[in-house]
Amino acid sequence: MKLTRITIDPGVCTGKPCIRGLRFPVARLLGLLATGTTRDQILADYPYLEPEDIHEALQYAALLAEDETVDLAR
């Protein structure tokens, strides 16, 4: 699966994955979704984001969950 909307650039957000180089970290978008912010609200609050950005951020998170393990006890 090729993700074209997720960019990683050492000069943008210290190399954290971002949405299309917009200095909007994928983690921030996922955090908004995790706290119950709806897609429609995210798109209204951040008009430069597109529905496809949200979809691809979720795909990225799913790929990470397949390959990474996080110590939940910390």
List where the protein language model places each region.
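A short, structured beta-strand/loop element
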Residues: 1-40
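C-terminal structural segments of small proteins and small subunits
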Residues: 40-44, 48-74
